[in-house]
A protein has these predicted regions:
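Alpha/beta-hydrolase superfamily serine-hydrolase fold, recognizing
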Residues: 1-285
Length: 285
């Protein structure tokens, strides 16, 4: 049997590039250097088009992360008209905050610096992440302190125009730990470099809820109502502060969902995410 198809080109090819070095940082007691890398999914077609970029930040309690773990799902965003970058950042085993946020901002600057190569619209950046990555998503969107921009490509902005944190820790000063010893061993304390229960002011100052202003970009916050790792109230706090500042914010609650629940990977949730980023990043700027 033979078949012939006469086709019109209506969709681009989607290219996956892994392990792109976006920065080099000190390692092993500052004696050595190591690469920080990102994975990229971008459309390739015959037209000279550029696309909004969404930066994904993996979770893992700031203790571990795998930038490639969610590429299958992130490809959904690429197929809806976005460049998608999944970025590596240093964990709290390597150093304390704000090192991790500095890495995320460095990745965003790198992507802007190489926008032509990867067909990125430099004016349209979104950021999305889960849990620990949700915290970094919030901070990347809210904390515009110029001292956080370190390394290369400093002539480029690290600002983003939309944010979608999943089950993010938003107030490190208010986690419900039973006692000081448990708090000292918590992922939040390891990230900050101090006990968040005994240093509540310092913990607050490094929390997303303390960084909200009326200039915040649009937010879609997603959280399960039965989260036993990061309390649902953490997202409610951020939502309330953003709403008080009259910011563009939506809290999408997943009824009965626990932390990193399979509910987050259902079509209905991804439809909401795609709608949010298309609405916020495809509009006129």
């Amino acid at each position: 049997m033979r078949k012939t198809l006469k086709l019109e080109i209506r969709k681009p090819q989607y290219v996956v590039c892994t392990d792109i070095t976006y920065a080099q940082v000190d390692s092993w007691y500052d004696h050595c250097r190591r690469d920080l890398k990102l994975d990229l999914i971008y459309p390739e077609d015959r037209e000279d088009k550029v696309y909004p970029c969404i930066v994904w930040i993996c979770g893992g309690a700031w203790l571990r992360m795998d930038k490639s773990a969610h590429l299958a799902y992130l490809s959904r965003l690429a197929q809806n008209g976005f460049v998608v970058a999944s970025v590596e950042y240093r964990t709290s085993n390597e150093g304390t905050y704000p090192m991790q946020l500095q890495d995320v901002k460095a990745a965003i600057r790198y992507l802007r610096a190489h926008a032509k190569r990867y067909r990125i619209d430099t004016n349209r950046f979104g950021v999305m992440g889960e849990s620990a990555g949700g915290y970094l998503t919030c901070m990347a969107a809210l904390d515009q302190d110029s001292s956080l921009d370190v390394g290369e490509y400093l002539e480029y902005s690290s600002a983003v125009q939309a944010a979608c944190p999943w089950y993010p820790p938003t107030d490190a000063s208010a986690f419900p730990y039973d006692d000081v010893e448990k708090a000292a061993m918590s992922p939040e304390s390891q990230l900050m470099g101090f006990n968040v229960m005994t240093h509540q002011k310092e913990a607050w100052d490094r929390s997303p809820v303390s960084k909200v202003t009326a200039a915040a970009p649009p937010f879609l916050i997603i959280h399960g109502t039965e989260d036993h790792t990061v309390p649902y109230s953490q997202s409610e706090k951020l939502y309330n502060v953003l709403e008080k500042e009259e910011c563009d914010v939506t809290l999408l609650s997943l009824d009965g969902a626990d932390h990193a629940d399979l509910m987050f990977f259902q079509d209905e949730v991804w439809a909401e995410i795609v709608h949010f980023f298309r609405e916020k990043l495809f509009r006129e700027v």
